[in-house]
Amino acid sequence: MAAAASPAILPRLAILPYLLFDWSGTGRADAHSLWYNFTIIHLPRHGQQWCEVQSQVDQKNFLSYDCGSDKVLSMGHLEEQLYATDAWGKQLEMLREVGQRLRLELADTELEDFTPSGPLTLQVRMSCECEADGYIRGSWQFSFDGRKFLLFDSNNRKWTVVHAGARRMKEKWEKDSGLTTFFKMVSMRDCKSWLRDFLMHRKKRLEPTAPPTMAPGLAQPKAIATTLSPWSFLIILCFILPGI
C-alpha cells in the first residue's frame, strides 16, 4: 500500500493542477536574479570604508550598504517599505557576517604573479538566480583590481581558477570545508530566501488590490479560476515546490 502524503505537503500538492495549467497554457515566467557585490579593502586608508556592498535585483540597484559600520547608504523606493521587517534585518546581519569572513580570508591570502595597484582590494560577487524552469543557481566570483581570479559554483561546490595568481588561494579555500559550506549556504539558502521576499513584495505591488467584482450567480471566468500570474508561477516553482 502506498504511503499517505505528509499533511505538511498537502497544501503544496493541492496547487499542482493550477501550476501545470499555467505552465502549458499561459507561458513561462522569466528568470530572476539577486546579486551582492562586495568590496573588501584589507588595509584601508584613512576615511576609506573597508567593506561596502552594492546589491541588485534583476540587475537593478536596490541597496548600497556599508557593512563595516552597519550603515545603509542608499536604497530603492520599493525597498524602503521592507526596511523595518525581520527579513531586511536578517539580510543586513548576514551581509555583515560575509564581509567580516571575507576580510579575514583576505588578510591570509597569497596571490602569485600579481602586484596590486593600491591597497589589496577584494571584489566579490555573490549571486543566486531562479531560472525559468525553477532551477536555483548560486555562485561566487572573486576579483582583484577588477580582474577575475577565482569562481565558486555553489551547486556542485566546484572551484575554478581564472587567473594563475589564484592557484594557492584556490588550493587553500578548497581544503577548507567550513568555508566552502559557508559560501554554499549563503548563496543557496539565504540569498534564495531574500530573492523570494523581494519577488513576493514586488508581486504584491504589481497585482490589483482586489479582484473584479462579478454579478451573483455568474461563473468565475476560466482564466481567473485556473491560471496563475507569472509572478505566482515563478514563486511556486522556485521556492515552494522544491520543498515537497
Curated annotation (Swiss-Prot):
Q: How does it sit in the membrane?
A: Lipid-anchor; GPI-anchor
GO terms (molecular function) for this protein are:
natural killer cell lectin-like receptor binding
Instruction: Show which residues constitute the signal peptide.
Output: 1-29
Domain of life according to the entry: Eukaryota
Presence of the UniProt keyword Plastid in the record: no
Q: Which InterPro entries match?
A: MHC_class-I_related, MHC_I-like_Ag-recog, MHC_I-like_Ag-recog_sf, MHC_I/II-like_Ag-recog
Q: Which residues form the propeptide?
A: 218-244
Q: Which residues lie within the region annotated MHC class I alpha-1 like?
A: 30-118
In residue numbers, the region (MHC class I alpha-2 like) covers: 119-209
Keyword tags: Cell membrane, Disulfide bond, Glycoprotein, GPI-anchor, Host-virus interaction, Immunity, Lipoprotein, Membrane, Signal
Q: Where is the lipid attached (GPI-anchor amidated glycine)?
A: 217
**Main localisation:** membrane
Q: Which residues cross the membrane?
A: none
> Is the keyword Transferase assigned to this protein?
no
One Gene Ontology cellular component term attached to this UniProt record is: plasma membrane
Cysteine pairs forming cystine bridges in this chain are 51-67, 128-191
Tell me where in or outside the cell this protein is found: Cell membrane
Q: Which GO terms describe its biological process?
A: antigen processing and presentation of endogenous peptide antigen via MHC class I via ER pathway, TAP-independent; antigen processing and presentation of endogenous peptide antigen via MHC class Ib; immune response; natural killer cell activation; natural killer cell mediated cytotoxicity; positive regulation of T cell mediated cytotoxicity
Where are the glycosylation sites? 37
Pfam families attached here?
A: MHC_I
Which additional comment does the entry carry? UL16-binding proteins (ULBPs) are unusual members of the extended MHC class I superfamily. They do not contain the alpha 3 domain and lack a transmembrane domain.
Q: What does this protein do?
A: Binds and activates the KLRK1/NKG2D receptor, mediating natural killer cell cytotoxicity.
Under the subunit heading, UniProt states: Interacts with KLRK1/NKG2D. Does not bind to beta2-microglobulin. (Microbial infection) In CMV-infected cells, interacts with the viral glycoprotein UL16 and UL142; this interaction causes ULBP3 retention in the endoplasmic reticulum and cis-Golgi and prevents binding to and activation of KLRK1/NKG2D, providing CMV with an immune evasion mechanism.
- Family membership, please give it: Belongs to the MHC class I family.
- Record's protein name: UL16-binding protein 3
Gene giving rise to this polypeptide: ULBP3
